[in-house]
Amino acid sequence: MAESHRLYVKGKHLSYQRSKRVNNPNVSLIKIEGVATPQEAQFYLGKRIAYVYRASKEVRGSKIRVMWGKVTRTHGNSGVVRATFRNNLPAKTFGASVRIFLYPSNI
């Protein structure tokens, strides 16, 4: 049997980028599993992110849909990254799982 290869790591959508009083929904903060420092997070810059969810209406034979984004830069000292999505993630996804794909590769 063929060996399976891991194509993505899991992450959590924490929040939007924000200041004391203002939210910026264009930028989402993502916590990647197993990443604890900005140096470790550097590896994921430019990687593609997918938020996979199920909808009630079937489109083209599937109820599963995806919102795509990209890791843009690190955020803070705890290994959190900033990401932009083609369409902003809705606020109901705070705490939801996202997939950070290991491509495009820069190794």
Swiss-Prot record:
Chief site of localization: cytoplasm
Stored SUPFAM superfamilies: Translation proteins
Swiss-Prot/TrEMBL keywords: Acetylation, Cytoplasm, Isopeptide bond, Ribonucleoprotein, Ribosomal protein, Ubl conjugation
Glycyl lysine isopeptide (Lys-Gly) (interchain with G-Cter in ubiquitin), cross-linked positions: K47
Gene Ontology BP annotations: cytoplasmic translation; ribosomal large subunit biogenesis
PROSITE patterns for the chain: RIBOSOMAL_L35AE
Modified residues (N-acetylalanine): A2
GO MF annotations in UniProt: structural constituent of ribosome
Post-translational modifications: N-terminally acetylated by acetyltransferase NatA.
Other information: Present with 65600 molecules/cell in log phase SD medium. There are 2 genes for eL33 in yeast.
Protein family: Belongs to the eukaryotic ribosomal protein eL33 family.
The protein's name: Large ribosomal subunit protein eL33B
Source organism of this protein record: Saccharomyces cerevisiae (strain ATCC 204508 / S288c)
